[in-house]
Each structure stands twice: as structure tokens, then as C-alpha cells.
Amino acid sequence: MLEVVISDIQAREILDSRGYPTLYVKVTTDAGTFGEACVPSGASTGIKEALELRDQDSSRFQGKGVLQAVKNVKEVLLPVLQGISIFDQILIDSIMVEADGTPNKEKLGANAILGVSLASAKAAAATLGRSFYRYLGGCFAHVLPCPMMNLINGGMHANNGLQFQEFMIRPIGATSLKEAVRMGADVFHSLKNILNEKNLATGVGDEGGFAPQLKSNSEALDLLVLAIEKAGFQPGEDISLALDCAASSFYDTKAETYDGKSYEEQVNILADLCDRYPIDSIEDGLAEEDFDGWELLTAELGESIQIVGDDLFVTNPELIADGISRGLANAVLIKPNQIGTLTETSEAIQLAHSQGYTTILSHRSGETEDTTIADLAVAFNTGQIKTGSLSRSERIAKYNRLMAIEEELGPEGLFKDSNPFSGE
């Protein structure tokens, strides 16, 4: 293979979709090729996530600046990566992890490291003249993922009184990614009309979903079912429902209760919702450290719906392995910035798949126009993706990229939902 090495790395502070700073990174090779990446940021974060380095300077951006992370890219990572083969991703990532030297990447920042990791891989793809998904996944990269579309936002993604964070639809009856996007858009507009008729707000939350003032989680689910029907689809057959409870956000660690309820009561609430609505996936139904609750939830519902761990696993291969050994959940949410390198992200996906767990590639609530996760979902054949609602251009950019990939793949492309409980 042609020997091409890293010659330069640039970084700068940009803004994400919430108006807070994040990193843009550009890696250039001695062949003149380059790759670019923008790093996302979460609002609801797991306590064991890799550290997102912020300046803590209250005089700018409420302390959320990333100038130190930018400096770390230029002054620490560039010197140790200059001259390294652009094609040796494992070496590139291991050099950065070693340069940081901490378990959670707190010295240099996972945001600095991830930006360089992704931009390096994109530069390698550009050097070979390949699409990013094809460079990473080779000839096996051909599965278009089923989207999980967040149409009603609550929790930490909206200030509207809803306890759960995401109320999603999954167009399981679609035969192509393009059709899935169209179905989602139809339901989105149907829901907007319903909200207008009920004199409910149609402003949107961080991820592009509506954020009306509602009295209960059930009311949000009722609205989704009605929107699906009014758009001309059959709930549970054409389109199913999914939840992200983000239960850690309403868990009292001292009392070990969920808004005053025990983990047994919380599991019963979720089981009741599954009986009443066509739900086939629940994410973070229990708090990340409530292992007894996770065991019960998996035992009660793990044979009938997808039980997704996000805060529970934080895309960390060690935590995923531990969770698998405990029998917790049956699916893993994959967020590259939770772990900080492309190599570790790949390891997390491969580990989950090897043990029969499904994976869902996911955005963060603070996003940019970067479409990397669309390529990653196809590259690793995850079969599912979470990238928000059918509004806000930082969300739409990912759907548009997926449709472009589907067109590029042609007959090779396969739209396939990896959730084994779809439509049950």
C-alpha cells in the first residue's frame, strides 16, 4: 500500500446546535488529502463517559469553551502523530490514548482525541478515493439502518414537564431508507397538525422533536399513535414506538427511587406501557447504577422488546463486557464521543454483536452538520440509527447522507432493521 503519513492537524472552536462551542478538526496528509470532523456533545451524559474537556472560563460561553482542547490538538497530538501512517488507525488511536494517559481521557479531552481520530480515518478514505463507510466496512458495508425518530422531546432535552426524554417512532414497515424517511416525515407533519388543533406548542427541542406541555408520558404516546394513524399508517405494523427514559435523570441515588417509586414499580410502569402501546424498544429504563433494576427489567421484558443500554454502557467495551456477564439489557447504544476513539467504538460494536446484542449508532443532543455517524452505521452494519426528528438541519443532514449512501450502494444496499422484536 502507498505510504502516506500525517503531515498536519488543524483544530478550531466552532458552535454546535445548542450554541455552545465544540471542536472542528482537519487532518492533512503528505499526499495533500485530508479529512474533517466535528465533535458532538451530550446533555444527558453517563457518569462513566470519557471526559469532554471544557475551559471552565466563566467569561466566555458560560465556561463551556474548548480552547484548551484545541490547544491540545495542536501542541500535543500533532507532534506525536506527524509522520504516522494515515492507514494505521489502531496505532493513531493508541498513540493518542497513551499521550493522554488517563482512564477517561481527562488530560487531553475525549473531544480533542475523537476529532483527530475521525478526521484521520476520513483522510485515509480520501487518500484511497473511497467513501468513508466503504473504507471502514469494505464490501460488507451494505446495510441501511432503520431510523429511531425522536418526534416528542422531554426530560433534559426540553423544558416541558415530560419525565421521559425521547418518544420515538420506528418505520419498521419501510422497504428502503428513503421510504423510512418519507414515512417519518409524514408522521412528523401529521403530529404538528394535531398539536396545532389541540392548541399545543409546536416549538421543538434539542433533537428536533416537538416539546409540548403534556401531563404524562402516556399522553405523549397517545399523540404519536394518533399521528401515525392520521398519516395513513398502522401502529405496530408499519410504524412502532420506542422510548428513551433517561431514567438516571429522575433517579434519587440516596433513596434509590424513581420519583419516589422502587425499581420494581418502575419496571411495572414500563411493562404496562408495552402492553398498551406498540413499543418494541426501551432505552435507559433504569438508572445506570441500578443493576438490580436492570436485571429485573431484562428478565421481565428482554424476551419481547429491545432493552437498550446507553448510560449503562457508555460505549465502553469493558462496561459492555461486564453488563453482558450480568445479563443486563440486550442492546447497546453506540456514541463515539462517549469513548473517544474510532478504534474503541469499533471494539464496542464488535463485542456487542459477538454476544448477540444489537447496536444502535447514535447522535448527541448537541450536534453539528457532520454526518459521520451515518457512515459509521452503514460501515458497521448496525441496522439501527438514532439521529433525531425530521427537523433541524443538523439532524436532517444525517438522513440526507444515508439516502445518498443508499443511492450509491444501489442493488447492493439492504434496508434492514436489526431489532429482532420489530412489530411484535
Curated annotation (Swiss-Prot):
The keyword Lyase applies. Binds a second Mg(2+) ion via substrate during catalysis. The keyword Lyase applies. One of its GO terms (cellular component) is extracellular region. Mg(2+) binds at residues 244, 283, 310. It is found in: Cytoplasm; Secreted; Cell surface. It catalyses: (2R)-2-phosphoglycerate = phosphoenolpyruvate + H2O. Pfam families: Enolase_C, Enolase_N. One of its GO terms (molecular function) is phosphopyruvate hydratase activity. (2R)-2-phosphoglycerate binds at residues 165, 335, 364-365, 386. Its cofactor is Mg(2+). Gene3D superfamilies: Enolase-like C-terminal domain, Enolase-like, N-terminal domain. Its main location: cytoplasm. Disulfide bonds: none annotated. The active site is at residues 207, 335. Its EC number is 4.2.1.11. It comes from the Bacteria. One of its GO terms (biological process) is glycolytic process. Keywords: Cytoplasm, Glycolysis, Lyase, Magnesium, Metal-binding, Secreted. Pathway: Carbohydrate degradation; glycolysis; pyruvate from D-glyceraldehyde 3-phosphate: step 4/5. It is an enzyme of class 4 (lyase). Belongs to the enolase family. Catalyzes the reversible conversion of 2-phosphoglycerate (2-PG) into phosphoenolpyruvate (PEP). It is essential for the degradation of carbohydrates via glycolysis. HAMAP family: Enolase. This is Enolase. It comes from Chlamydia caviae (strain ATCC VR-813 / DSM 19441 / 03DC25 / GPIC) (Chlamydophila caviae).
